[in-house]
């Protein structure tokens, strides 16, 4: 049973729409139908009463009062509007004249009815109605069909009572006219039977139209569901913003969420790539130190501080990149002041160990007064990548110089290597792009360096060195030690 319920519940929007609208249409159809039928019934009763009153007036015209007796002479070719049975009473309720002798009908006439004009109904069984119909064969045949279907069926006859005041030629009379054809056998009564068929046909016609209306109305939601499935299957990046007014806000917020999640994912992936790249230098120093220990070129006491320093740097780098990954775009940069010379000394010392076999000669021309304002790890990451590239591609010499203004810090790194072709001087800053594909590397370092300098409103400019190789000018902006007043 639970499985069966799960197939139908919760109901889809289309089924809900169809059930709700079908219920509304059904209720309205029933309400309108009942109002129409009640109105028709009232109109039918009024029409019947007018017809029977016309018959009553006809008999009153034909009636004559002679010798204290009532005489009614009916012409042979009289044209009556409908088959009727007429009874005439005096003011005391005594029967003066009857069109035919029908005892059961005379008993059904209530004395109270004879006191005023009115419209009434009497109930009779099929056999009594048959006596009242006399020679109407078509109606008798219909009545026989009713008798065959239900022998206990009851028929309803309309009765019109009209009171005529006394005149010089006629005493006060009450004429009762009974419609001999029961209401159930009149063609106008069939409207009650037709109502069920009309209501059924109405629903059969309306439900397909409601289905079309539901399909058309819910198309934007179906389109949105399809786009969400495409997102799940990675066939789409964003939802289509061109949708209905009611869904615009939802789609816009979902697209913002998707963009935010994609940017966060890209940021984590980029940060992880940058972290692995930043660990290359300290790991290379550790590897070089271990190699020196193995070949006994360095004692344990000499190697220990070097290894501890690189392990500390690895720990700092991991913490630094975890912090970067959790930073939001509007996070303020650190305003710490760091002397540049000691930072570059540590970097060159580590790189000398990495490129010990190559015999790189790194020279520094840095004034002790020059300082960097910002996050120390940002400076180390930028200059570490730039210096690593210089040491990797130089023949022997790498020169570092620096100068500072109120707003900017300029650090120039030059080498005597093959240099960078003019057409490649912008490409090298794109992630994954490398000029020399023969040497190991991922093409990440300079891209990371430029991204960090942009956070300081700075840049890195590649050019040609006086030594014959590459010249990299690193520019850090926002170097005022205290924020300026706005």
Curated annotation (Swiss-Prot):
Location, primary (coarse class): membrane
Histidine kinase domain: residues covered: 274-480
GO cellular component, one term: plasma membrane
Segments in the Cytoplasmic topological domain: 1-16, 216-486
A GO molecular-function descriptor: ATP binding
Membrane-crossing residue ranges in chain numbering: 17-37, 195-215
InterPro entries: HAMP_dom, HATPase_C_sf, His_kinase_dom, HisK_dim/P_sf, PhoQ_Sensor, PhoQ_Sensor_sf, Sig_transdc_His_kin-like_C, TCS_sensor_his_kinase
Membrane topology per record: Multi-pass membrane protein
SMART domains (UniProt xref): HATPase_c (SM00387)
Positions of post-translational Phosphohistidine modification: 277
Keywords: ATP-binding, Cell inner membrane, Cell membrane, Hydrolase, Kinase, Magnesium, Membrane, Metal-binding, Nucleotide-binding, Phosphoprotein, Protein phosphatase, Transferase, Transmembrane, Transmembrane helix, Two-component regulatory system
Annotated catalysed reactions: ATP + protein L-histidine = ADP + protein N-phospho-L-histidine
Positions annotated to bind Mg(2+): 385, 442
Positions of a divalent metal cation binding: 151-152
Coiled-coil spans in chain: none
Domain HAMP residues, every copy: 215-266
Localisation: Cell inner membrane
Entry's EC annotation: 2.7.13.3, 3.1.3.-
Residues the record marks as site: Plays a critical role in the switching between kinase and phosphatase states: 202
Binding site for ATP: 385-393, 415-420, 434-446
Topological region Periplasmic: 38-194
Main function: Member of the two-component regulatory system PhoP/PhoQ involved in virulence, adaptation to low Mg(2+) environments and the control of acid resistance genes. In low periplasmic Mg(2+), PhoQ functions as a membrane-associated protein kinase that undergoes autophosphorylation and subsequently transfers the phosphate to PhoP, resulting in the expression of PhoP-activated genes (PAG) and repression of PhoP-repressed genes (PRG).
Stored PANTHER family: SENSOR HISTIDINE KINASE YKOH, SENSOR PROTEIN PHOQ
Self-association and partners: Homodimer.
Record NCBIfam families: PRK10815.1
Protein name, per record: Sensor protein PhoQ
